[in-house]
Amino acid sequence: TLHEKATYGILQEFARSGLLKMLYLVSNINLENILGEVPIIGYNNKVNELLVSTVHMINVFKNSDPVMGGIEEPAEASRIATFGISDIEGNEEKSFFSLDRAKEKCYIYSINEERLKTEGDLRKKIVSTVKAQAETEDLKVSFGVFPTNYQQDYCYILNYTSIIQSDNR
């Protein structure tokens, strides 16, 4: 609706002007594509679970000490953002919103502590993946590696821009 489009644009302008510290954009369509086939009953629960668990884990890591790297604050002007996930090899990034012209990206690697202790080439893999992203996308890229007790490894992504986004829901 016209009201939604106006609000969408105004919130982005508020973020750019500094009235909002950060505006995170999320598309239900993108979340659904990440999840794959989701039944009608339970649809909202699955979509919300993906979003909430991602935001929760990013907040946990923002308040934790990495064993390598760090989560850098974005530039003052980069106040429009979205989340994403990837496998830790960086083969396929899945963004929660398709940002036009992202300027900065932060990878948050959540890796099983035992793997961090035993896998000798893991550091090299992570650094080469991050470097490749910085070169191919012409972005400022940072990353942090965090130990976990989870068996599954995860890579969370924060994408930032200062550019007003079109409504691509």
PLM features: residue spans?
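Tubulin/FtsZ superfamily GTPase core signature
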Residues: 1-169
